[in-house]
Design a protein with these regions (language model features):
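Buried hydrophobic-core signal for structured, non-transmembrane domains
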Residues: 77-79, 136-138, 205
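Bacterial N-terminal signal peptides
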Residues: 7-15
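Structured beta-strand segments within beta-sheet-rich domains
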Residues: 100-151
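Short, surface-exposed beta-strand/loop patches at domain edges
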Residues: 148-183
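Exposed beta-strand and adjacent loop surfaces of beta-rich binding modules
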Residues: 24, 74-78, 147
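Boundary/junction segments of secreted and surface-exposed precursor proteins
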Residues: 19-43, 183-187, 191-210
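Low-complexity, serine/threonine/proline/glycine-rich extracellular segments that form mucin-like
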Residues: 34-104, 129
Length: 210
């Protein structure tokens, strides 16, 4: 009984106090500020909104830096996206949001297109507080039914941005003070397929183990 109670205490302590890397980056096509099955690229789509939430997981749980000391604030951001699927994406440019402009973020890595990839990066003199930010919008022209996904670490030498992540006071695990998708956090949603994953056989199986 004593060991059982001790185990419960340990689990409770972990659930309450254990910091985690669970930031969330996502795209929004229809402009409602969230990512859902409705965020599908069609020929009528002209913009894709890009968001970073530095201190919440996809599920909405509050997260903190793993060192328990430094904030998950942001002074630099980069992202790289990749187009795939049935159809094509023409990248026409990137416009940073008014919120990020007001926070003093200025272009660091110009919006660059290389084949199916595109990337951009901005930097500020001061750190934006932890939270959810609309970074900006990508202007696109769509044919068919393509999808856009985030690239964690880019291997495309033509794109100046390293990949998808942000500079912060929190000490990241590989890229110093650079929280990187696929290394330090994994919650990411691009645009959705016109055929929802849930409707396929494999998709139905995956839904059982979410």
């Amino acid at each position: 009984m004593r060991h059982f109670l001790l185990l419960l205490g340990v689990i409770a302590a972990m659930a309450i106090g254990a910091p985690a890397y669970s930031q969330y980056v996502f795209m929004d096509v229809n402009g409602d500020g969230v990512n859902t099955l409705a965020d599908v690229l069609t020929s009528s789509s002209t913009t894709v909104h890009v968001y970073f939430d530095t201190n919440h997981s996809k599920a909405g749980a509050t997260v903190t830096c793993t060192d328990g000391v430094h904030p998950l604030d942001m002074a630099i951001y980069d992202f790289v996206v990749h187009a795939s699927g049935s159809g094509s994406v023409t990248y026409n440019g990137y416009t940073q949001s008014a919120v990020m402009n007001a926070a003093g973020f200025q272009q660091l890595n110009a919006f660059t297109v290389s084949g199916q990839n595109a990337g951009v990066g901005y930097i500020a003199n001061n750190y934006a507080n932890p939270g959810r930010y609309e970074l900006g919008t990508i202007s696109v022209t769509i044919t068919g039914s393509p999808i856009l996904t985030f690239v964690g670490t880019s291997t495309d030498p033509a794109i100046p941005s390293f990949g998808t992540g942000y500079g912060t006071h929190c000490d990241a695990s590989v890229n110093t003070n650079e929280e990187t998708l696929g290394i330090d956090f994994f919650d990411a949603d691009g645009t959705r397929s016109s055929t929802p994953t849930e409707s396929t056989t494999w998709g139905k199986i995956k839904q059982l183990y979410r």
